[in-house]
Amino acid sequence: MLKMGVVLFIFLVLFTLATLQLDADQPVERYAENKRLMSPYKRRAILHAPREQECCEPQWCDGGCDACC
């Protein structure tokens, strides 16, 4: 009877926990697949957007932009 309890514990508890862990990984896989299917132009725009900063003239700069001109 003890062996039957151990087998039931393994299948009902541990197997359930293992499948729940796999479910948690699916959103990341979907996000990676969505990025892979995106056109190269859109991917480039996403990658360059954080690096883009507003340029301003040095005499008008208030710290909210870079003096890159």
From Swiss-Prot:
Primary location group: secreted
Listed name of the protein: Conotoxin VnMLKM-04
Subcellular location: Secreted
Domain notes: The cysteine framework is III (CC-C-C-CC).
Signal peptide bounds: 1-24
Propeptide, residue positions: 25-51
Upper classification of the organism: Eukaryota, Metazoa, Spiralia, Lophotrochozoa, Mollusca
Domain of life: Eukaryota
GO CC terms of this entry: extracellular region
Keyword entries, A-Z: Disulfide bond, Neurotoxin, Secreted, Signal, Toxin
Entry comment describing in which tissues the protein is expressed: Expressed by the venom duct.
Disulfide bonds: C55-C69, C56-C65, C61-C68
Single annotated GO MF: ion channel inhibitor activity
Record-stated family: Belongs to the conotoxin M superfamily.
